[in-house]
Regions:
Chain A
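Short amphipathic alpha-helical boundary/capping segments
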Residues: 2-6, 114-122
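Residues within the DNA-recognition helix of helix-turn-helix
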Residues: 22, 157-162
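Arg/Lys-rich amphipathic alpha helix in sigma70-family domain 2
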Residues: 32, 53-60, 70-90, 108, ...
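Structural recognition of an alpha-helix C-terminal capping motif at a helix-to-coil junction
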Residues: 42-49, 62-74, 156
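Internal acidic/polar
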Residues: 78, 86-108, 112, 139
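A short pre-motif secondary-structure segment
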Residues: 129-133
Length: 175, 250
């Protein structure tokens, strides 16, 4: 029996194995969709706790990551609704983390945070498509399943999203 | 959009894929994992009976009385009990609620699931006590051991019954929880002061007994329970001692 089926049957070790496998993907989604690292951590925790509660209702034919992303999209949307108005992205970049790491790690994280600030300038659906399609490198078909939109729509939006992101990154670079 | 633009965008998309990917911080990874493993289990309700079938149950009156008592307890001190830790006066309400939950369980397999869920909560209490209130550590350990012994007793009852899907699922749930608990207890033991080691080692031993019982499920592959805390002798203090000898235990 696969891990997801066992987890749906209440096997906590199976759920822990799924958690280990998918934590980073969920965290990255939250990281890019939200304003600060702390918010991303809170939302990641909320996603997995909700997933644990929803496991008995999990449909095993559906990919488990799609199940997690579905929850993550809802939790992020709820979070953004509750948090508005929030700190500016300039604040988010300046105070993204209280824990400075080694220089190289910090530089890589700065890149990721600059990208996050640029992604925030896109519409919510453009953000999802950029994250799933280009940062997580999912196929157009998978992105269509994750977002519930036809593949042709995804292909149309992804080009506009890329153009908007490139422009946003350009203006972020001028700051 | 022109071909030129499309090519530029395709190149830009390739650049995006080369961005370093942030990953979950190690502290989040560890804390969230522990909190998920300690979270109370959602027990799926058994299938609903037809309304008239309820009246044929011999324990109906007892169950209704218990539900009423539970409601009174919930109204009287539900929130206090929910946030209480072992050793608090309000914790008596939590224990009473646990007993009623077990009393009104439809069958032994459901009762075993209930007892396992209760032991999950006692483990969470233990972790909360260690993190926020060390004075509650001894009673929390004693309550955890008592909850595990109730799981062990219920497990013995269920193991003696003929195989059914519900029975096997309950035993599998108990086995999974037991393995997780042993791992969690060993992690806790590493953080506990020397004077709290007695209780936690006893808790590990009781939980290993539970795990050993689950290995008797036919068709279950033999998987040894995690051993006693690393670096500690297996015949350390507490082996074979009665749990009543624990500090903080009534």
């Amino acid at each position: 029996m696969d891990l997801a089926r066992r987890a749906a049957g209440g096997d906590r070790r199976a759920f822990a194995a799924l958690y280990d496998r998918h934590l980073d993907a969920v965290y990255r989604y939250a990281f890019y969709r939200l304003h600060t690292d702390a918010e991303a951590e809170d939302v990641t925790g909320e996603v997995f706790h909700r997933a644990l509660v929803a496991m008995p209702k999990y449909e095993p034919r559906r990919p488990f990551l799609a199940f997690l992303y579905g929850i993550a999209r809802h939790v992020v949307a709820d979070h953004l609704r509750e948090q508005r108005p929030s700190a500016s992205f300039e604040d988010a970049i300046a105070h993204a983390s209280d824990a400075p790491g080694p220089e190289e790690t910090a530089a890589r994280l700065d890149d990721a945070r600059r990208l996050r600030a640029a992604i925030a300038r896109l519409t919510p659906i453009q953000q999802d498509i950029v994250i799933f399609r280009f940062l997580e490198e999912r196929s157009t078909k998978e992105v269509a399943q994750l977002t519930g939109k036809p593949e042709s729509t995804i292909r149309g939006i992804q080009m506009r999203a890329l153009a908007a992101l490139r422009a946003a990154l350009g203006s972020e670079g001028e700051r | 959009m022109s071909d030129m633009n499309d090519r530029d965008l395709a190149r830009f998309a390739e650049e995006l894929a080369r961005f370093d990917r942030p990953s979950a911080p190690p502290a989040l990874r560890a804390q969230l994992r522990a909190s998920l493993l300690a979270a109370p289990v959602v027990v799926v309700s058994p299938p609903r009976r037809a309304p008239f079938a309820l009246f044929t149950l011999p324990s109906l009156r007892l169950a209704l009385a218990a539900v009423l008592i539970l409601a009174v307890i919930a109204m009287a001190g539900g929130s206090a009990a929910a946030s209480s830790l072992p050793g608090d006066p309000a914790f008596a309400l939590t224990r009473a609620g646990d007993e009623i939950q077990a009393l009104v369980a439809f069958d032994d397999a459901t009762r075993l699931m209930t007892r396992v869920a209760q032991s999950d909560r006692r483990l969470a209490d233990l972790e909360t006590a260690l993190a926020h209130r060390p004075s509650a550590l001894a009673p929390a350990t004693a309550e955890y051991i008592a909850a595990t012994e109730r799981v062990s007793a219920e497990l013995a009852t269920v193991l003696a019954q003929p195989r059914t899907a519900a029975r096997d699922a309950a035993i599998a749930r108990a086995a999974a929880a037991s393995a997780d608990h042993i791992a969690a207890l060993q992690a806790l033991a590493a953080r506990l002061p020397a004077d709290a080691q007695f209780g936690i080692q006893r808790a590990i031993e009781v939980q290993q007994t539970v795990h050993g019982k689950t290995e008797t499920l036919p068709g279950r592959p033999a998987s040894p329970a995690p051993s006693a805390a690393p670096g500690r002798p297996s015949n350390g203090p507490g082996r074979g001692s009665a749990p009543t000898a624990l500090p903080g235990r009534p």
